[in-house]
Amino acid sequence: MSFNKKNINKLFYCFIVIHLILWSLAPSLTNNNLPLDTIEALAWGGNLDWGFNKHPPASAFFAEIFYQVFGNNDWAYYLLSQIFLVFSFFIIFKLSQEIYKNKVFGFLSVVILEGIYFYNYTTPEFNVYISELPFWTLTVYYAYKANFRNNAKDWAMLGVFSAIGFLSHYLFSYLLLSITFFFIYIFIKNKKFNFKSLIAFEIFIIALIPHLIWLVENNYITITYGLHRADSGLNDKDLIDHIIYPLSFLLKQIGILIPFWIMLFMLVSKFKFKLNFKDTKFIFLIFINFLPIILI
């Protein structure tokens, strides 16, 4: 497959601008009301605190910023969601170039992601999942740079974006655990602890202190809410439901990913490449892509 590499940047930026306009405009013209999660974030934003009963505060904070600028114009919150998404695409584009040293692969990485249901159809709803996306990609990006360049600035940025991601959604912790396991693997492999990694850890903890204080003062309400939701089906009398529902969920996810797999197969088949299982870059990708799923 041949691309004009000089124009790949233009192609990428055209792609994300089209995505931004399309997925901001379509719901603005067709929806009578904002999605429930977006309304909830706006309600929380009107009374900002360091946490809320369901989630940590970041999504409410970002929604409130847009409310202060755009007021109650619905289109603004569809735009907010798409800004978060296309910025995530931009970071993925940058990370792919860092890893593969090839802008074409960076662009194709984003195109393949566009084929996933959760990166197109569901994105107009600004919620905690959209809120964490740019910080998920930024955390991965700076974890990569911190490991391979060992620059104090990169470690600091890793700590900052890890904290904001965690303050968007607690499930962000699965990514943080995966990155931590990767660093442990590297330290063991090199037989040397990297003290610069403490920069990220210290910044992460300091940034979380206000939220942790709020959490204690409010009887850990965000955590108990999540545990209650997870525990709500354990007392069901029909045990077969504990098999049927997970299988149903799995089949739905497989169905949703069909366009992704088709695109992946069509694109990958055009390139010749060889996997090096000992390559640290490849191992990094395994840790940050698959370990969070396994941990969940």
Residue ranges and their predicted role:
Residues 47, 154-170, 204-208:
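Membrane-interface alpha helices of multi-pass inner-membrane proteins
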Residues 97-100, 139-154, 165:
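Membrane-interface transmembrane helices that cradle and orient dolichyl/undecaprenyl
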Residues 175-278:
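Transmembrane-lumen/periplasm boundary regions of multi-pass, lipid-linked membrane glycan transferases
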Residues 9, 79-100, 115, 137-142:
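Transmembrane-helix motifs of polytopic, lipid-linked glycan transferases
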Residues 16, 106-114, 162, 166:
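Short helix- or helix-capping micro-motifs
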Residues 26-41, 51-65, 71-76, 219:
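Extracytoplasmic catalytic/substrate-binding loops of multi-pass membrane glycan-assembly enzymes
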Residues 121-131:
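Short acidic/glycine- and proline-prone juxtamembrane loop motifs at membrane-interface regions
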Residues 63-67, 80-91, 112, 132-135, ...:
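Transmembrane alpha-helices of multi-pass, membrane-embedded glycan-processing enzymes
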